């Protein structure tokens, strides 16, 4: 039996509750939906017979809207082509979901303006404008959640690989900005725990996609490393034809070494009184080859100070004094600096890895494992 008509929902309400006492339900209120020409018998060659419009309020704060065309009764899944808009989505309201993945979002507002196309043949999401402002986001690692973190990381990596390899799925950010935000990594599996973070962070993204096929994707980040050291992070991602092709550069200067003290206490049981840290790196990946370097720099670092440490146990005083002596052997006497340049040139470890897998490995191995090389030498 064929039918045709108008379908609507007025002032609807939807609640998602995980049933956990520590998490609040997610609510979508004031749901208004109107579907015109709602039919099970579209005309021939009519992919989207219906006009659809939806507006809603998320957690009493964020406006969400969708307007376009659809075939809601298509088999095996509905077909939708529509503009979408999200205004002032408060990240703290996503905590029940983000918390599952050890992510804490305490502040921040997200605006999205884009277009989506969904069918059994393909999924295409084009975000024309993305703006995230005043966000504070931390990934929290702890001994208790380590097994779960490993499982989540494996699932996320596998899903990312599937999405990248699937030619029917495309997610693209045409233009995105992150303003006045802070992102960090909190390690609660050490004693003491510590936090590595970038504050006052601004990020700009152009033409970035899960499938690098057209044009060059650009990412620019500025901020303050550990709240004190000005940093710049620039990347250019060219189309994969057929292998990853991109450049990365990182510059961190004038970071107060005292900012590292909790990290140093966690791994080396030592303190610093003053000094500066800097880090420089340029990397290029093309034709399954990596070319580049990392260069950390320590300047005017003092590890041991008798006045500062007079109340510490004698054994620890001696240990830190020896560490300071080793650093003295490494320093340039005229400028009192300790530095080394590590060449990273060579073949890509996994020749089948995609761009985002290689970037992840480089950030982890070339940056985070090299961020404290001067301190590694003095331990």
Give, region by region, the residue ranges found by the protein language model:
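Extended terminal
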Residues: 118, 123, 167-171, 188, ...
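Structural signature of outer-membrane beta-barrel domains
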Residues: 132-140, 299-301
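Extracellular loop and loop/strand-boundary signature of outer-membrane beta-barrel proteins
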Residues: 98-102, 266-268
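Elongated, acidic membrane-bridging lipid-handling scaffolds
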Residues: 1-93, 98, 158-249, 254-259, ...
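Transmembrane beta-barrel outer-membrane domains
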Residues: 103-107, 272-274
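Long, internal scaffold/assembly segments composed of regular secondary structure
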Residues: 120, 125-129, 171-179
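Membrane-embedded beta-strand positions in outer-membrane beta-barrel channels/transporters
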Residues: 32, 111-113, 136, 182, ...
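Transmembrane beta-strands of outer-membrane beta-barrel proteins
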Residues: 83-85, 128-131, 251, 295
